[in-house]
């Protein structure tokens, strides 16, 4: 398989560790069908270099147990724990009209659903254990911020139009709604 640039790679799984003593790997899969991993000629690392070639696999809870070329011992399998597995975007089937891959969101502008204000661009999609979060690079510069990838915070994703519409939740201490704080003579903010 030819190497792909990192931005054209899609994360499809992660080596969770060894399974047994003969070098089989437990792989957590991020595909709808866990056995999809067996359909790819080879899995790569994030930099596009070869990682694993799956020879056989069977479904288990949270993924697959796989036998991979060149991994013949428990120690070799354990050494791969945490390895993220990627495939080129072109190796995946095209999503249906109203579907998309999370990687397709990277780089899309995010606009406020009510005001059409440009909030920023999606830098990455993260998951720290709960729901997915969109990391937003602010339009006006500054530190990136996270937007929950929920129906309430992201009511519309328009892949064909190349835009994500968002209704970010209010920050702690901010008023609800579009009002902005006024400053009094001492420079302190208050809300009317």
Swiss-Prot record:
Return one GO MF term. ribosome binding
What does UniProt give as GO cellular component?
cytoplasm; ribosome
Q: Where in the cell is it found?
A: Cytoplasm
GO terms in the biological process aspect are: ribosomal small subunit biogenesis; rRNA processing
**Ranges where the PRC barrel domain occurs:** 97-172
Q: Does the keyword Cytoplasm apply?
A: yes
The UniProt keywords, alphabetically, are: Chaperone, Cytoplasm, Ribosome biogenesis, rRNA processing
One of the Pfam families matching this protein, by short name = RimM
Instruction: Extract the ranges annotated as region (Disordered).
Output: 168-192
Q: How does it assemble?
A: Binds ribosomal protein uS19.
Family as reported in the entry's similarity comment? Belongs to the RimM family.
Function, as annotated, reads:
An accessory protein needed during the final step in the assembly of 30S ribosomal subunit, possibly for assembly of the head region. Essential for efficient processing of 16S rRNA. May be needed both before and after RbfA during the maturation of 16S rRNA. It has affinity for free ribosomal 30S subunits but not for 70S ribosomes.
Its domain description in UniProt is: The PRC barrel domain binds ribosomal protein uS19.
The record's section on PANTHER family has: RIBOSOME MATURATION FACTOR RIMM
Q: What is this protein called?
A: Ribosome maturation factor RimM
Q: Which organism is it from?
A: Caulobacter sp. (strain K31)
Q: What is this protein's gene name?
A: rimM
């Amino acid at each position: 398989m030819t190497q792909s640039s990192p931005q054209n790679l899609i994360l499809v799984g992660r080596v969770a560790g060894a399974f047994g003593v003969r070098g089989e790997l437990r792989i957590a899969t991020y595909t709808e069908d866990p056995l999809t991993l067996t359909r790819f000629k080879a899995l790569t690392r994030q930099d596009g270099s070869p990682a694993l070639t799956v020879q056989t696999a069977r479904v288990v809870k949270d993924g697959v147990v796989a036998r991979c070329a060149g991994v013949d011992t428990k120690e070799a399998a354990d050494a791969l724990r945490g390895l993220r597995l990627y495939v080129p975007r072109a190796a995946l089937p095209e999503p249906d009209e109203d579907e998309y891959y999370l990687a397709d969101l990277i780089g899309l502008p995010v606009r406020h659903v009510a005001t059409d204000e440009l909030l920023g661009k999606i830098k990455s999609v993260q998951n720290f254990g709960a729901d997915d979060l969109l990391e937003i690079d602010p339009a006006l510069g500054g530190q990136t911020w996270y937007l929950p990838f929920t129906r309430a915070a992201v009511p519309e994703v328009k892949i064909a139009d190349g835009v994500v519409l968002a209704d970010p939740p209010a920050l702690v201490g901010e008023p609800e709604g579009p009002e902005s704080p006024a400053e009094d003579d001492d420079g302190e903010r208050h809300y009317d």
